[in-house]
Structure formats: C-alpha cells, structure tokens
C-alpha cells in the first residue's frame, strides 16, 4: 500500500545503508508515486543509459582522469613483479578497462597482465569479448570473465575458499546497484595485494544528481537500479573501515535540453534515465513533471551554455589504499 503523502518511508544512504527512516518530503508533500509509474527494466535501463552517454561528457571526463591521474596510480602497482593482476567489478562492455590496461602497459613494459572481469549481463560480456578480439596490442594480457554479480562472486570465493589477491581493482559507476555497499567495499578491499589500489568512480556530491535525489526520490518508483548514493556516502564507509583514500573531482556535463521539448524521443529517454521511470513524461502526474523540469533548470542542478541546459554530472574518483 502506498504511504500517505504527509510522511513517506524512504531508504536513505547512511553509514550502514540499513536503517529505514521516516523522511518529511517538505514542500513536495503532494507529489508521490501513482500506480501507472514503474521503474525501468534492465533492457530499458540500457536504452536510457545509451541516450545519457550520447549527450554527456561522462566518458570524456573519465579520459581526463586516465590522462592526468591514472599513469601515477599504475606506476606504483606490481611492486616489481612479473605479473600484475587486475579485477574489474561491473565492467560492462569493457571500453574503460582496455584504456586502463593500455596505461598499465605503458607504465610497465613487458609485464604480464592478468585481467579478470565480474559482469552479470551476458550481452555486456559478449560485447566485451568482441572488443578484445578487435583490439590491437593486447599481447601479454589474459582475460577471464565471471558472469556473476559482485555478491555472487564474493559468495563463490568464500565457498571455495579461493581468496585471490589483485594489484588493482576498479568499481566504475556500479555501486548504485549493490545490495550491501559497506560489506562489498570491505570484501573487495580485502582482495588487494600489499600496495594494491582500489578505484571507485561514483557521482560527486557537487553533481546535480545529489540535489535532485534529496528532493524528489520519494516521488519516484522504487528501483532495483539501487541506492541513491554519491561520493560522501562512499568516503564515510572508507573512514569507518579505517581505509586511507584520496578523492579526485572531475567535471562532467550532460546536455538535457531535449527534456524540455515536448514529444522529443531523446528527451523522453533522458527523463526516464533521470528518474529511473519508464515513460516518465507519459505516466507521471502533471504536477510532478512540471516540478521536476523546473528543478532541473535550477543552478544546483544545471547551468546554461549557448542556450542549452547542461546538467551537472560531476564525478568523484576515489582511490583507496590497501
């Protein structure tokens, strides 16, 4: 049964990500989920996500990080060993993985690289394998895919008592969909070799997402795409675990101008991705549509450039020490 609009029960990010609290929706008290609104399926999410990538600088933002910071991280890996072990958690179709491998090869010429991948989506695994088949300069690099979720991988490791260690583990934009964030971070951190590094890429607290989620998540359908979290939630977990870390902030933008053009298909996909809702513009109450579109134009969410509305998609790159 839907909670009364006066007081909504929300799952909010906290140190343990477990406590449900009653949260006052403040001035949005008349806005709430109606039966016609539903969350995106996995396939619909992929389609909406592609629209996001097509109109955002997310990958360019990661490329800047790869250029400015990653060479220094990679140079410190391996501790003189002849083989460097990498684990990608939720690697998707592998584009970012291969870019990082190239940086590692440049930092450690001739070193063998054992790259393992945890990715539950079979389409993504197939696309990753195809990318590897087409890629040049992968001599000395081995690939092992685990078609599992991160929690399934953890369970398998514990059941078989095969706790393999890695020199570099990365979790790029995937912790939103993890059931138990603190224990997931704790487990994969325990998989690091001495002097290893854990890279977590997550939305920054300076992003428009942080402002949008604080005000409107109670108005949207619950989704198994997971937690509404930003970098502050992750660094709080790391501090509680006593893990040393450094945060690198990189600006990223997303052109959402089409969100405000009635009937625009790309704008519809963008609103679906923003809200995690299938056909948000066609199913949400008019008051919610209006309020959300108005919020997207506010300075805490977006800026204007050459007549376009650019949503703030800033990323935090968190590098944790072993």
UniProtKB/Swiss-Prot annotation:
It is an enzyme of class 2 (transferase). InterPro entries: HHMT-like, SAM-dependent_MTases_sf. Pfam families: Methyltransf_23. It catalyses: carnosine + S-adenosyl-L-methionine = anserine + S-adenosyl-L-homocysteine + H(+). One of its GO terms (biological process) is carnosine metabolic process. Gene3D superfamilies: Vaccinia Virus protein VP39. GO terms for molecular function: carnosine N-methyltransferase activity; N-methyltransferase activity. PROSITE patterns: SAM_HNMT. Keywords: Methyltransferase, S-adenosyl-L-methionine, Transferase. S-adenosyl-L-methionine binds at residues 90, 119, 150, 172. SUPFAM superfamilies: S-adenosyl-L-methionine-dependent methyltransferases (SSF53335). The keyword Cell wall biogenesis/degradation does not apply. Its EC number is 2.1.1.22. Substrate binds at residues 58, 313. Monomer. Two different proteins belonging to two different protein families are able to mediate carnosine N-methyltransferase activity in chicken. This protein, which is not conserved in mammals, and another protein (AC F1N9S8), which is conserved from human to yeast. N-methyltransferase that mediates the formation of anserine (beta-alanyl-N(Pi)-methyl-L-histidine) from carnosine. Anserine, a methylated derivative of carnosine (beta-alanyl-L-histidine), is an abundant constituent of vertebrate skeletal muscles. Belongs to the class I-like SAM-binding methyltransferase superfamily. HNMT family. This is Carnosine N-methyltransferase 2.
């Amino acid at each position: 049964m839907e909670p009364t609009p006066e007081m909504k029960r929300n799952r909010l990010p906290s140190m343990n990500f477990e406590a449900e609290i009653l949260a006052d929706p403040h001035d949005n008290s008349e806005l709430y989920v109606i039966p016609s609104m539903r969350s995106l399926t996995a396939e619909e999410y992929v389609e909406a996500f592609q629209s996001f990538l097509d109109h955002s600088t997310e990958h360019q933002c990661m490329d800047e990080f790869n250029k400015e910071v990653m060479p220094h991280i990679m140079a410190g890996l391996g501790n003189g060993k002849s083989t460097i072990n990498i684990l990608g958690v939720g690697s998707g179709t592998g584009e970012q993985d291969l870019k990082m491998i190239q940086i590692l090869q440049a930092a450690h010429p001739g070193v063998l690289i054992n790259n393992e991948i945890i990715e539950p989506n079979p389409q993504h695994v197939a696309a990753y394998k195809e990318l590897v088949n087409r890629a040049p300069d992968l001599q000395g690099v081995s690939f092992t895919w685990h078609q599992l979720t991160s929690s399934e991988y953890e369970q398998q490791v514990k059941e078989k008592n095969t706790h393999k260690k890695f020199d570099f583990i990365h979790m790029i934009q995937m912790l939103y969909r993890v059931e138990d964030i603190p224990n997931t971070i704790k487990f994969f951190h325990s998989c690091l070799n001495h002097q290893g590094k854990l890279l977590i890429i997550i939305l920054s607290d300076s992003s428009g997402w942080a402002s949008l989620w604080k005000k409107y998540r109670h108005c949207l359908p619950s989704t198994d795409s997971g937690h509404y979290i930003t970098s502050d939630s992750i660094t709080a977990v790391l501090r509680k675990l006593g893990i040393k870390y450094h945060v690198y902030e990189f600006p990223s933008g997303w052109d959402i101008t089409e969100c405000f053009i009635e009937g625009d298909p790309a704008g519809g996909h963008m609103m679906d991705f923003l809200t995690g809702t299938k056909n948000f513009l066609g199913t949400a109450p008019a008051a919610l549509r209006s309020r959300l579109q108005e919020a997207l134009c506010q300075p805490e969410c977006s800026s204007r450039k050459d007549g376009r509305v650019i949503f703030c998609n800033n990323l935090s790159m968190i590098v944790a020490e072993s």
